[in-house]
């Protein structure tokens, strides 16, 4: 019985620290130092939440830039079904999916160059990716320009404006946030 008291007091102490103090402290510091990120990086227009800068959305119209394919269950970009979505490179089903996506993209983008960017035909590991390269966005310019009656130059400038450089120059590549880019396109129409 004497050994039970130190074990129980250690358990209660660690429960208090790991179950109360640590979560409250990290939440408070996150809200203090990074309030936008700690609250989901939500993109707001007035009182309306239009999306998150961290999670892609299913933009399908010709007047929008399309992101990476999402293979999440039930619906594209379903955050509750996030998980590995790509098949193994050796799987013949992956070849069929990529061929179908390439054919679909070429049909939707007849004025684009013939080389479809790889990130437009392969799903991300989470199925929720919101970023593509500026080159993949530029590949879609003819379709978006035609659908929105905008010039190639206007869209090129918009892509450049919403391109984000990696934190370290030689690690990573520039990306464009598709959600922010498409919301900016909608603002051009207003």
Swiss-Prot record:
It is found in: Cell inner membrane. It is a single-pass membrane protein. Pfam families: KdpC. The keyword Nucleotide-binding applies. The gene is kdpC. It comes from the Bacteria. This is Potassium-transporting ATPase KdpC subunit. Belongs to the KdpC family. It comes from Escherichia coli O127:H6 (strain E2348/69 / EPEC). The system is composed of three essential subunits: KdpA, KdpB and KdpC. The keyword Protease does not apply. One of its GO terms (molecular function) is P-type potassium transmembrane transporter activity. GO terms for cellular component: plasma membrane. InterPro entries: KdpC (IPR003820). Keywords: ATP-binding, Cell inner membrane, Cell membrane, Ion transport, Membrane, Nucleotide-binding, Potassium, Potassium transport, Transmembrane, Transmembrane helix, Transport. The chain crosses the membrane at residues 10-30. Part of the high-affinity ATP-driven potassium transport (or Kdp) system, which catalyzes the hydrolysis of ATP coupled with the electrogenic transport of potassium into the cytoplasm. This subunit acts as a catalytic chaperone that increases the ATP-binding affinity of the ATP-hydrolyzing subunit KdpB by the formation of a transient KdpB/KdpC/ATP ternary complex.
């Amino acid at each position: 019985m004497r050994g039970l008291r130190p074990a129980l007091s250690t358990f209660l102490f660690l429960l208090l620290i790991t179950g109360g103090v640590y979560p409250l402290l990290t939440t408070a510091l996150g809200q203090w130092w990074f309030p936008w990120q700690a609250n989901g990086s939500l993109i707001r227009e007035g009182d309306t939440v239009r999306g998150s800068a961290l999670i892609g959305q299913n933009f399908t119209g010709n007047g929008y830039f399309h992101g990476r394919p999402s293979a999440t269950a039930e619906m594209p970009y379903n955050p509750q079904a996030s998980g590995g979505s790509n098949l193994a490179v050796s799987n013949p089903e992956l070849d069929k999916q990529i061929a179908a996506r390439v054919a679909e993209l070429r049909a939707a983008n007849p004025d684009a160059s013939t080389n479809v960017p790889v990130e437009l035909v392969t799903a991300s590991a989470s199925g929720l990716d919101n970023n593509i390269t500026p080159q993949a966005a530029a590949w879609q310019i003819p379709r978006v320009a035609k659908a929105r009656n905008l010039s190639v130059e206007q869209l090129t400038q918009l892509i450049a404006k919403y391109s984000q450089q990696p934190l370290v120059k030689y690690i990573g590549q520039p990306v464009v946030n598709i959600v922010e880019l498409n919301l900016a396109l909608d603002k051009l129409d207003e």
